[in-house]
Every structure is written in structure tokens, then in C-alpha cells.
Amino acid sequence: AIRHEVPFILDSAYGGPFPNIVFPETENLWDNNTILCLSLSKLGLPGLRTGIIVAHEKIIRAVTAANAIVSLAPGSIGPGLVCAMVEDGSILNLSDQVIRPYYQEKVKQAVTWVTAAMGDLPCRIHTPEGAIFLWLWFEGLPITSETLYQRLKQRGVLVIAGEHFFPGMQDPWTHRHECIRISYAQDAESVQAGIAIIGEEVARAYDESVSKTD
């Protein structure tokens, strides 16, 4: 990208330096050819939808001009909040001392609930490395993750079917139909209840498969 003078756009929705919802130790990536995009929504104020761009000054000026045209009246609350935090460095303390520990505690609790809800079901949890999601793999799931999504939706639980994360694949790899992504960002009661329902529907799918073979 540098050799061809093509800017490298990095959408760092959960990475460092803000909001830094990344649990393993990492190094922040940036140079003059990188456009690093961050979001103020992880402060718990998603309605502000304030974007933070770290880039070369000439790119910042171009984005500012474009934004003035596309968004005729952009909100000023978000920029007003974040400007002072960037100037005094408190935005980094907020990431490391408040936001990341908060989600680390939530993911630990979510893993405990998943383990309890799935019991003896063939469920594996992808190592949580950050963001606000858990990936669950149900090996040998008798239905597709899309079908599981539809069943869960009928019961008021929303997940993301794993097969949508494998675009363009032509070979019949069953793994892509056996995984779902769940969010643990909501309140504890809702997350625990949703995980319990997921366990019930997955158990139902396996039970139906056994019944058909008997």
C-alpha cells in the first residue's frame, strides 16, 4: 500500500488505543499511510455516533471537508466530549481502566453461563480475545446456523449465523454452518436468559436428529 501510495484504512471498532476492548497484549498500528478509524459509541453513548480519525493532516482536512458536505449539521456533543479527553490523555485511561475491565468481567460471566447452559452438548467457545462477542461452535449441529438463528429469533433471542462470515466459499465445509456469534453487551439478566434459550434450542436440534435416526 505504501509503495503504491494507497492509504490503508483500519476500522478499529474495538481495538487500541480506544476503546481498547482487546484482552491479549497488542501494539497499536499506525503510520502516515494509515487512516485509523475509531468510534466514541463504545463509551456507552451509541447515539452520538462520533467518529475519531487518526491520519495525516492532509487526509484529516479532506475528511473534514467531505463531512461538512455529507452531514450538513453534524452533532457537536460527541466532539465536545472527546476533544478535552484527547487533549489531557484521559481517553486512554478510560480505555484501560474502565472500558476494558468492564467487558473483561462481562465475558468471564458470559463464558460461565454458556458452560452451564450447554451442559454435555458438543459446544466449544472460541477464546475470547476482545470486542463484545462470543463465538460458539456446535460440532455436528444437525441444523444450519441460519435455521438456529430463525428458531432463536422466534423466541426473542438474536444471534448472528456463522455462515454469513464465509462469503464466496464453494466447498461444503460444515464448520461454517455450525457456529454462531452472540453479544454479551446487554444487561446481565438478558444475556443469561438468552444463553439459556440458546442451550434449549441447540439441545432440541440434537434431540430431533436422534429421534429421526431411531
Regions found by a protein language model. Name each.
Residues A1-D214:
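PLP-dependent class I/II
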